[in-house]
Amino acid sequence: MKVGAAVFELPGVVALEELSFSGRTPFPYVPGLFYLREGPFVTEALRRLSVVPDLVLVEGHGIAHPRRAGLASVVGLVTGRPTVGIAKGLLCGEVSWDSEDTGWVTLDGERVGLAYRCGRRTYYLSPGHLTDLETLLELMDLTDRRPHELVRRAHRLSRS
């Protein structure tokens, strides 16, 4: 498995540091237990960075997860860093669209995330660790409604 990490300064999306590394994972993919497979690699990537990020975006869910603790939540707990999850699919809950391209993800009557459309794709943001729904709105503002671009850059590093 190969993982990538990138640190940006916002606003302006200035790249400060990028890295990638690979290793073997002893765990198979198990739906809902993504952390067992990906978590150790994500936390190791964060450990290897020389720049300590103020906020970590994780490709995976935060509290918009059946256990209310997805990959972003667990990575935050393990590292002690504030995290936000960003995912391309909704694991649980439902979206109530406030506008054509933005809505809230609710689970058991509680807001647990933000959904937004960019082009034909829908993305789902949810607080992980030491963050809240307000953090999601601030992130949307700081990235011109494109936080997925930051995660995509790190994802590309894992594919190179």
Go through the PLM ranges and name each one.
Residues 14, 39, 44-46, 89-90, ...:
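C-terminal binding/interaction regions
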Residues 65-110:
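A contiguous pocket-lining binding segment that forms or flanks enzyme active sites
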Residues 13-15, 29-33, 80-84, 109-110, ...:
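Glycine-rich loops and low-complexity Gly/Arg-rich segments
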Residues 25, 31, 67-68, 109, ...:
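Solvent-exposed, flexible loop/coil residues
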Residues 29-33, 59-66, 121-127:
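Flexible, glycine/proline-enriched loop segments at strand-loop-helix junctions
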Residues 1-52:
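A glycine-rich, hydrophobic loop/mini-helix early in the fold
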Residues 43-75, 79-81:
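Catalytic-site beta-strand/loop segments enriched in glycine and acidic/polar residues
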